[in-house]
Amino acid sequence: MIHKREPAAYMDVLLLADESEELIRSYMKEGDFYAITVDGRTAGGCVCTSPDESTIEIKNIALKEAFRRQGIGKAAIKKIEALYRNKGKTDVIAGTSNSSIENLLFYQKAGFRFHSIKKDFFLSYPEPFYENGIRGIDMVVFHKKL
């Protein structure tokens, strides 16, 4: 289901969750990349970083359209949580855009709670982006105890 891999070959998947290739390249170096597979096929990918000793941050998680709404993303999160819990992490955080309605639902259904808002976070992106007719401006940060 999740397999540690070199992220460069999965840029197309990571771009599904983050519009800035430049930013993806910067945080890919900071953490671990996991390919999410189903029956040997690449379904998606996830980049995890460690902002501090006790916390894991899901910097980017994305599934290809054909694999969405089947419980695969939630199962991948559970595997990642177990992996890092076994490494001594106690908390997991994840951020998404204020305009990413599906992601806001996804994280809550996966047991995350609202934690904070990073105002104007996405204004630093090279190009503005819109989802659901809403401009992505603020980052909504979610938290979950492991």
Give the ranges of each region predicted by the language model.
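Conserved active-site tyrosine of GNAT-family acetyltransferases
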Residues: 106-107, 112
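Short acidic/polar active-site loop segments enriched in Thr and Asp
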Residues: 54, 90, 113
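Conserved GNAT acetyl-CoA-binding A-motif
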Residues: 84-97
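Short, P/G- and charge-enriched loop/turn segments at secondary-structure junctions
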Residues: 21-23, 126-133
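Acetyl-CoA-dependent GNAT
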Residues: 1-65, 118
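Conserved acetyl-CoA-binding loop-helix of GNAT-fold acetyltransferases
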Residues: 63, 69-82, 109
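Short hydrophobic/aromatic beta-strand or adjacent loop that forms the aromatic wall/cage
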Residues: 31, 136-141
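Conserved beta-strand-loop-alpha-helix junction that forms the acyl-donor binding cleft
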Residues: 94-104, 115, 119-125
